[in-house]
Regions:
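Accessory cap/linker subdomain of secreted extracellular hydrolases
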Residues: 161-308
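Histidine-bearing beta->alpha loop at or near hydrolase active sites
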Residues: 348-363, 375
């Protein structure tokens, strides 16, 4: 089993094409240490069609053993380096690390705008710029497209929390507190007071989680009836295996991301004191005993200000999402559809559902098909 730190991490990384060059992007702030400089990858084919694709990468844990690196792994599907396919069609491609890992949407927007300016200054002015993002990076891509329609001609969000980070925080927080109710012996701390060093015990937690869930199938079924987190229900065997996989993925974020999330927003952005949880049986005991968390209003405002999509599209956006996504639930797509409709901008949104269980479980053909749809719509765009 592979935990998804960022999407598309399941294949070996091939050598970079000769058209691609890696380099640091210098910053003007002398307080920024050299190892935290933004790393950039720029690929320009000989037959450049004057269109540029920028990629916003997915979640990388904020712990120091995860350095600021280029997202080469997540750009490889079916042993194919996706930018190489774009280069063959004449597109230039660029991506970068950010100045921090973890909860980075606000930082990522600034860094990718800097990347665009750097490309324009060092390579030339493209005629069209397209933004693509995977998982957490898809949220960044949408916000860039919404906020800077004068700079981006179209966008593609893959398996992304398109409905906004507040909904994603609610999903992750609810799963954690309900998990703790059914399996109280795994964690000795609450959902949002995760110790900074808790990640060092992750391997121990994994062993405990697997044992608890496989030895108490009834409690596992209850957990998923309450949280509605995605599993593959095709058989009892696949239910158990995917239930464990989903739990490990979501609890990974709880342990590895929560301290940085709280620090970045200046408090707890999650509230469940008045939430009613409903499952198969014994809902009264569940609601009496489940951990109740009080949010910090400033942290909630921060999440809404910097991590919430608005739906105010002025350029075409295509989304690609697994129907049974265990990490970023598909209902994000329904939320965003409502936001876009509320802005009367539905003509700019194309959502493509992909059957099956998994996070960012796409084939090369599916990603290229969605990319082609985005290009076709953007090139045919004639203005509001």
């Amino acid at each position: 089993m592979m935990l998804v730190l960022s999407p598309f991490t399941r294949a070996e990384v091939p050598p970079l094409p000769p058209e691609c060059k890696q380099q640091p992007l210098a910053v003007n702030d002398p307080k920024t240490p050299e190892e935290d400089f933004q790393l950039v990858l720029i690929c320009v084919p000989e037959n450049w069609n004057r269109s540029l694709v920028i990629y916003a990468h997915g979640f990388v844990p904020p712990q120091p053993q995860f350095p600021l690196v280029l997202p080469i792994n997540e750009l490889t599907i079916d042993n194919t380096f996706l930018p190489q396919l774009l280069l063959a069609q004449g597109f230039a491609f660029t991506t970068s690390s950010y100045h921090k890992n973890g909860a980075v949407t606000q930082q990522a927007i600034d860094d990718l705008l800097d990347l665009l300016n750097f490309f324009q200054g060092s390579v030339g002015l493209p005629s069209h710029v397209f933004i693509i993002g995977g998982s957490e990076g898809g949220l960044t891509a949408i916000q860039l497209l919404e906020q800077h329609p004068d700079q981006f001609a179209g966008g593609l969000a893959l398996c992304a929390p398109v409905g906004g980070a507040p909904h994603q925080i609610k999903y992750l927080g609810d799963f954690r507190v309900v998990f703790d109710y059914f399996f109280p012996d795994v964690f000795s701390f609450g959902a949002f007071n995760v110790p900074l060093e808790a990640f060092k015990q992750w391997d121990t937690y994994v062993t405990q989680i697997i044992a608890e869930m496989t030895n108490h199938v009834g409690a596992t079924a209850q957990l998923f009836s309450v949280t509605r987190a995605a599993v593959d229900p095709s058989s009892l065997t696949t239910f158990i295996s995917t239930a464990v996989e989903t739990a490990l993925d979501l609890l990974f974020y709880s342990i590895w991301e929560t301290p940085d999330l709280v620090a970045t927003g200046g408090g707890i952005p999650y509230e469940n004191r008045f939430r009613l949880y409903v499952g198969l049986t014994n809902n009264l005991a569940l609601n009496r005993q489940v951990e109740r968390v009080k949010s910090d209003p400033e942290a909630e405002r921060y999440a809404r200000m910097f991590y919430q999509t608005k739906g105010n599209l002025e350029r075409p956006l295509v989304t690609l999402h697994n129907l049974l996504d265990p990490i970023v639930p598909f209902d994000h797509e329904l939320i965003y559809r409502g936001l876009v409709a509320g802005q009367q901008k539905s003509r700019f949104l194309t959502a493509i559902p992909v059957p099956g269980y998994g996070h960012c479980e796409f084939t090369t053909a599916q990603v290229l098909g969605a990319f082609g749809t985005m290009i076709q719509q953007a090139m045919g765009f004639t203005g509001p």
